């Protein structure tokens, strides 16, 4: 759970997960006061400066004023368990492998399903916490967890090799201005099994990623414009929900401003036009209303899409 308290110097945040917790405050005195308050009710132990939380390493550089989160130990353990420790790889998945992924056919050599699922689950956890660079590759393999072929397992081992050889990579948040930077894109009809497109988006704050996704679209797009428009709707839902959460936590203040419409970058001009205008031509009349979410929030002034 996440709790917010109003201290004399500003907002104090406390996050707890089972028996682990973090406290964030403007001053050490305010953080210590909250810890003392909790200690008066429950038996707790203060560990001082946070170094690790739920397997996520937290590195703070006070000189550079940055915080980096990473999972080097988990990355190395995953590579060791998969038998690829020490091997090197520069990308999680090659474009050729990604473009050729499809369900196993009769006669193909199948992989051990339990082993595949176990390794995939660990890779999914890492990409969800600190490794957005692996999101596309890991989610491309997830649909084959019920019947993985050896081709799928080989591709997964490539991803794990990359994770292990880049174990120290993480996300760094620094002194860069708050400015929320959001990007979205779509890979048209890239799934060979369903011919559905894949939506990808990322939200950046203080120079680091705070939210990201690579996911197959819920409906089949018949054009690149429609695929990109669906991506716009998906990222709009995420951004709006984040802003509402910030508002509920009273984070939208002088020290945490979000002024004017949030900008989302998209590289398809036809999709941008559809986001801004309520005129649908013959090529857009069939698009499901769920994907018009973005357009409504552009009209309200909360969002703006930029090429």
Predicted segments with their positions:
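Long, low-complexity, charge-biased intrinsically disordered regions
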Residues: 1-307
């Amino acid at each position: 759970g996440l709790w917010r308290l109003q201290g004399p110097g500003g907002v104090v945040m406390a996050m707890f997960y089972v028996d682990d917790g973090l406290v964030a405050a403007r001053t050490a005195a305010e953080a210590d006061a909250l810890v003392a308050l909790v200690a008066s009710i429950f038996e707790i132990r203060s560990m001082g400066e946070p170094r690790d939380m739920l397997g996520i390493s937290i590195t703070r550089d006070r000189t550079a004023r940055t915080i980096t989160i990473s999972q080097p130990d988990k990355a190395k353990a995953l590579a060791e368990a998969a038998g690829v420790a020490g091997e090197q790889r520069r990308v999680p998945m090659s474009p050729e492998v990604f473009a050729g992924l499809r369900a196993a056919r009769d006669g193909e050599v199948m992989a051990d399903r339990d082993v595949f699922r176990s390794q995939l689950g660990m890779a999914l956890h890492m990409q969800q916490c600190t490794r957005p660079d692996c999101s596309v590759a890991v989610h491309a393999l997830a649909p084959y967890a019920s019947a993985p072929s050896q081709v799928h397992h080989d591709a997964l081992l490539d991803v794990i090799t990359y994770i292990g050889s880049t174990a120290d990579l993480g996300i760094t948040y620094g002194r860069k201005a708050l400015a929320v930077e959001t990007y979205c894109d779509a890979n048209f009809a890239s799934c060979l099994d369903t011919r559905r497109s894949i939506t990808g988006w990322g939200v950046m704050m203080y120079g680091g990623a705070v939210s990201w996704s690579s996911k197959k679209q819920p409906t089949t797009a018949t054009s690149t414009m429609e695929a990109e428009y669906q991506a716009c709707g998906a990222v709009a839902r995420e951004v709006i929900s984040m802003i509402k959460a910030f508002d509920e936590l009273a984070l939208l203040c002088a020290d945490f401003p979000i002024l004017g419409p949030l900008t989302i970058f998209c590289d398809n001009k036809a999709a941008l036009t559809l986001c801004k205008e309520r005129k649908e031509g013959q090529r857009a009349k069939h698009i499901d209303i769920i994907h018009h979410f973005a357009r409504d929030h552009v009209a309200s002034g909360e969002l703006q899409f930029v090429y």
